């Protein structure tokens, strides 16, 4: 991702190894941090605490700006899997305005990507736990004005703000606002740093036809989001 001055080093934080694959970085497990052609990449694992630790690790490598790259769930029904959100603001609490993202980097990314990807701007909400039901998604959208939700962007933005370095996020949508995730899958996700775990596989295997259908559609849409991230990485290189 080449946004910013050519000599600047970017600290890119992703939650999952599959998200790192989209920028050509392989073999890095959660907790890892490796050099990258534009700076450093950290794979944090899922969730805010992991994301904050990863941002602090990569910042210590001497980067000039921080970025969060990965997938998010839609709160706005107009967003579909494979769409790309470049948020202008990250929020995490109803009584806090959150963090603005760097406008110059946003504009550079949007211009680079808009020829081949559907780009959306707006507020990204960072949750502590998965937002899984349609009712919860609708309530969060109405209360916050956010168009999508993730679990990592806000703590990374907070680290960037404390260090006084620019921050940007790019999120490919993997979960539509209209999807209801089975409770079995949500519980397994909530207890995992890596996304797919043995507990998730067991939850799917023993969940019955409804869970199997949900898992298939989730995997399909995650694939669409991952393809969008790979396209974005190629266009922004």
Where are these regions (language model features)?
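Active-site rim beta-loop-alpha module in soluble metabolic enzymes
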Residues: 101-182, 186
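Glycine- and other small-residue-rich loops at beta-strand/loop junctions that grip anionic moieties
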Residues: 40-44, 98, 129, 170, ...
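Conserved active-site and cofactor/substrate-binding residues in soluble primary-metabolism enzymes
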Residues: 18, 46-53, 104, 135, ...
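Short acidic/polar alpha-helix capping motifs at helix-coil junctions
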Residues: 17-19, 118-124, 198-199
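Short alpha-helical interface patches
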Residues: 17-28, 32, 134-142, 187-192
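Solvent-exposed, flexible loop/coil residues
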Residues: 75, 79, 83, 90, ...
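Regulatory input/activation interfaces that engage signals or partners
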Residues: 173-237
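Metabolite-binding pocket within alpha/beta catalytic cores that recognizes anionic/polar moieties
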Residues: 2-116, 147, 162, 234
């Amino acid at each position: 991702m080449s946004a910013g001055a050519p000599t600047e080093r970017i600290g890119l934080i992703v939650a999952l190894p599959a998200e790192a694959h989209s920028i050509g970085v392989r073999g890095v497990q959660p907790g890892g941090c490796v050099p990258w052609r534009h700076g450093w990449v950290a794979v944090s694992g899922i969730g805010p605490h992991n994301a904050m630790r990863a941002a602090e690790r990569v910042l210590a490598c001497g980067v000039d700006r921080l970025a969060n790259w990965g997938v998010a769930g839609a709160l706005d029904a107009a967003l579909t899997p494979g769409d790309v959100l470049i948020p202008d603001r990250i929020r995490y609490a109803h009584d806090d305005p959150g963090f603005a993202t760097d406008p110059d980097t946003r504009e550079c990314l949007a211009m680079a990507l808009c020829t081949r990807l559907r780009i959306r701007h707006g507020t990204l909400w960072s949750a502590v736990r998965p937002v899984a039901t349609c009712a919860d998604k609708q309530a969060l959208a109405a209360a916050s004005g956010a168009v999508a939700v993730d679990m990592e962007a806000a703590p990374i933005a907070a680290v960037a703000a404390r260090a006084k370095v620019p921050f940007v996020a790019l999120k490919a949508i993997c979960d539509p606002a209209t999807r209801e995730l089975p409770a079995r899958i949500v519980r397994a996700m909530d207890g995992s740093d890596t996304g797919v775990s043995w507990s998730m596989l067991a939850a799917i295997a023993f969940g019955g036809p409804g869970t199997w259908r949900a898992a298939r559609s989730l995997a399909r849409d995650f694939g669409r989001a991952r393809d969008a991230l790979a396209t974005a990485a190629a266009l922004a290189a």
